[in-house]
């Protein structure tokens, strides 16, 4: 092999290592939170809980990457996104940021309800909170006490250190 090809392959390997390592994932998470004007600590906690900063994480249900984005959710948030791009950590985080930002706006800037929707699904949450007047500052996690996974999820993100 020629030196130029080896050098190029080596640089590509370094780039892949930099992009896909957990330290870079943490830094990307902080940057995306700032860019999308999200609560940095809560968005950081969300990604930590979802994937433990593993860029190549995939759930049993098919959620992909750092933000554990379902392909159908990605298409809903960014209609023309090729699903394969969810494997790119930055694209995945941007999609997660846009989705949680959408949910926060939908649920009157209430993080606990937005997090429940991120975890359990919008439709499920909409049915659960039907006719509820949402207060921005109120913690609604107890509404989800009968949904142990979502209740625990909200607690982990809102109270993580």
Label the model's feature ranges.
Residues 1-14:
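N-terminal Sec-pathway targeting helices
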Residues 19-161:
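Catalytic glycan-binding domains that act on GlcNAc-containing polysaccharides
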């Amino acid at each position: 092999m020629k030196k130029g090809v080896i050098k190029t392959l080596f640089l590509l390997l370094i780039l892949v290592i930099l992009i896909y390592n957990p330290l870079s994932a943490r830094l990307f998470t902080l940057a995306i939170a700032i860019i999308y004007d999200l609560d940095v600590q809560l968005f950081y906690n969300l990604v930590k809980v979802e994937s433990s900063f593993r860029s190549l994480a995939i759930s049993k249900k098919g959620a992909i990457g750092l933000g554990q984005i379902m392909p159908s959710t990605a298409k809903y948030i960014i209609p023309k996104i090729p699903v394969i791009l969810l494997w790119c950590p930055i694209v995945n985080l941007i999609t997660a940021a846009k989705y949680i930002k959408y949910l926060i706006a939908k649920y009157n800037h209430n993080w606990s309800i937005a997090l429940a929707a991120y975890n359990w699904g919008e439709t499920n949450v909409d049915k659960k909170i039907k006719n509820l007047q949402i207060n921005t500052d109120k913690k609604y996690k107890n509404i989800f006490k009968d949904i142990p996974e979502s209740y625990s999820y909200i607690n982990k993100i809102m109270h993580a250190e």
